[in-house]
Amino acid sequence: MQPPPPLYALWAKAGVDQQGVRDALLGCGFPSASHVDGTTITNNDYARGEQCMLGKGFAYQERHTYCDAHPHLAACPATDGAAAAGSRQHPPAYEQWTRPDADAQRVQQAMRACGYASVIEPGDDMLLNDIAAAQLCMLDGGFQFTLPASALLCRNPPKLAACRDRVIDTAHCCAPPRAAGQR
């Protein structure tokens, strides 16, 4: 498996050399012209950077931009709201947490208190490390994750600073593992 190409290799504009592409990427808010991921940029900021590059006349060399794949993002140009809402293929994030004494409103309040920027789609506006810290806060608050433990960020690489080598009681924190293909 080949590593992904550097970010600057995915953009082109007539008369602009590689250094010009790198400078434009940094000018459009990308933290690096080579490689970015969820630990360095949010989904919305990535989409905003792509829109900036397109606005400067650069052409994206891959098949689809981030907004093509994620039209619901606030940074993406206005689209048909129904189509954008239909592009989500999973329930809102607040449905991923439960506690016997907490209704949906209390879950959402706890999520906000734990630092979630959104109770619907936190990945749009939060870095992975911040989501991991919020997940740990929810577990500390006695909430159970309704997805398998493997979906917790502190159970998957990359090692995030927020995880602090914490051991999570996977037998009690989360829903049981699912068989392949099971929803």
Where are these regions (language model features)?
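Mitochondrial intermembrane space
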Residues: 1-183
